[in-house]
Design a protein with these regions (language model features):
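Active-site neighborhood of HAD-like aspartate-dependent phosphohydrolases
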Residues: 1-49, 189-190, 201
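Acidic-and-aromatic substrate-binding clefts and catalytic sites of carbohydrate-active enzymes
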Residues: 19, 96-102, 152, 202
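Substrate-recognition element of Asp-dependent hydrolases with the DxDx(T/V) motif
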Residues: 84-133
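Short, surface-exposed acidic
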Residues: 31-49, 77-91, 171, 215-222
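Asp-based, Mg2+/Mn2+-dependent phosphohydrolase catalytic module
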Residues: 1-7, 125-226
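A short acidic, glycine-rich active-site loop
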Residues: 32-35, 61, 146-150
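Alpha-helical elements of Rossmann-like donor-binding domains used by nucleotide-donor carbohydrate transfer enzymes
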Residues: 22-30, 46, 70-74, 91, ...
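A metal-dependent, Asp-based hydrolase signature
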Residues: 51-90
Length: 226
């Protein structure tokens, strides 16, 4: 079935703290829109302290309505405001649509579709899905693994097994691009090819993929060769 190139989202495609116009700033704006008395650090703490419930479950990364309600209720309680799931989701999406992303890399990813299979593999909450789709057009991807759907995070061996089961290729025919060391190390343990990079390191990403597929890539995008 050939080769598969798999991309992370945050940091690789979307701007991630401390890069300007990043996801953390969007989260802070979201929380403070419901309670403007919070400082930026307090707003960030509201978010980070409510991602996991008392049983250690990432309720923010579940797809069922009960988990969504439970998560937003926790945010309301810790942040001292009262937003519905729809209100919070709408604001979260609106603020994240303002976040920068690496458009040139997205163009390159779409170009790769004619050469190999492409996948997206990311830990994210349900509110992020519309933003992700707006940035990358999920219909262009052969595979999409999002933690709020798989209920597995990239720090678990099970999710890597799921990816391998879905793609049905040997580990040496998988290339994984991620900005986080632990995710890269987990992929290496499986025998995957890896490239640890941020989205602004397009040349590094391209070089790694060229070595992976075994030849030089050339295409036209916005008048520039890829």
């Amino acid at each position: 079935m050939g080769k598969v190139v798999i991309f992370d989202w945050g940091g690789v495609i979307m701007h991630k703290h401390p890069v300007d116009n990043n996801d953390r700033q969007a989260i802070i704006r979201t929380i403070r829109s419901f309670n403007p008395n919070l400082t930026d650090e307090e707003a960030w703490d509201v978010y980070t302290k409510t991602l996991i419930d008392e049983n250690g479950i990432y309720i923010s990364r579940q797809d069922d309505e009960l988990s969504k309600i439970k998560w937003v209720d926790r945010i309301n309680r810790v942040g001292n405001f009262n937003a519905s799931v729809d209100e919070f989701s709408t604001r979260f999406i609106a603020e994240h649509l303002k976040v920068g992303y690496y458009k040139e890399l997205v163009d390159f990813i779409h170009f790769l579709k004619d050469i190999c299979q492409i996948g997206l593999f990311s830990d994210l909450i349900f509110c992020c899905a519309p933003v992700l789709d707006e940035q990358v057009d999920l219909s262009q991807f052969d595979y999409v693994w999002l933690s709020y759907i798989t209920h597995l995070r990239k720090n678990t061996e099970e999710v890597f097994e799921l990816v391998e089961k879905d793609v049905q290729v040997s580990p040496e025919d998988i290339m994984f691009i991620d900005d986080t060391t632990v995710n890269i190390e987990n992929a290496k343990k499986r025998g995957w090819n890896t490239c640890q990079a941020f989205g602004y390191e397009l040349d590094k990403i391209k070089d790694s993929i060229e070595k992976f597929i075994g030849y030089k890539l050339e295409s036209e995008s916005n008048g520039k060769k890829m």
